[in-house]
Each structure stands twice: as C-alpha cells, then as structure tokens.
Amino acid sequence: MSDLEYKIRPMTLDDYDEVYALWMQIHGFGIRSIDDSKEGVERFLKRNPTTSMVAVSEGKIVGAILCGHDGRRGCLYHVCVHENYRKHGIGKSMAVACMRALQEEKINKVCLIAFKSNELGNHFWKEAGWDFREDLNYYDFTLNEANICLLYTSPSPRDLSTS
C-alpha cells in the first residue's frame, strides 16, 4: 500500500465515457458492443443502482467494477484498475464496497468470470480468498434471432433418445 489518495463511490451513468476509456486501456479486456454500450450500461445501472463502483484519484476514474445481482446471486463484471494505479489497494477497496452493497440488498454469494489468460486478475482473486470452481462448465448464449431459431429447431434430448 502507499499514500495514494483515492475515493470509492457508486458508479453513475455520467461516469460512462471515462469508464469506457479506462476499459479500452486494459490489455485483453473483453468488451461487447451491445452490453457495454452506453445504453447497455444504463440498463445495468438502472437495475443495479447502488452496487457498481468507481475509484477516483486526482479527479479521474482509475478503477471500475460493474456489479449487479438477480435477486439471488451477485456478479462482478469488468473489474479493472488503471495500470499506473495498481498495487495501492484500489481493486480490493472497490471489491469490498461492492460486497457491502450486495449485503445491503441481502445477497450472500457472488461470482465473477476471469479470462484464463488474465494471470494478474486470477492471482488477485485467489489471494483475496475466492474459490476457483473446477466442478462447473461455463456456457454462453448470444440472444439473436439465428441462435434462438437454432435452439428451437434443434432436437431435444428426449428426441435424441428415441432415434
């Protein structure tokens, strides 16, 4: 830790341009045009108005976490700290602020996804006491008309067992 001064506060839509610029500076960051657009983040923040956080130092945003929940489980997205501001406790402080906000909303379990290639991030979460789950497979499904039609027309497991 150092004597770097920073403040953790809830993210607002007014922070979007600065947060997006920060995301663009992070090597290997996965950004999606729809979900991470200003409109996508606005939807997310409206649904989760108190749980996402930014870190501000010297008048600029140097860290951010999108954090939300579905009423049952919380999830962290796009956890990042500007490269020049790492190793000052900013990531931990933002994560703790998110966890406290989730607790206020009666959420008691949180998940996150980290790219396997994100060695620094994976080390951070392991050191912070998060459990790596080897018993799960993670699946993604993009909601677009072609995929939904494919799902609808693909055989169900019951159909496959009778052939």
Question: Over which residues does each language-model region extend?
Answer:
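A short, internal acetyl-CoA/4′-phosphopantetheine-binding micro-motif in the GNAT/acyltransferase core
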Residues: 79-86, 114-115
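Single conserved hydrophobic/aromatic residue that forms the stacking wall/gate
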Residues: 152-163
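Conserved active-site alpha-helix within GNAT-family acetyltransferase domains
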Residues: 92-93, 116-135
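Conserved N-terminal entry element of GNAT/NAT acetyltransferase domains
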Residues: 1-14, 146-154
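Conserved GNAT acetyl-CoA-binding A-motif
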Residues: 103-114
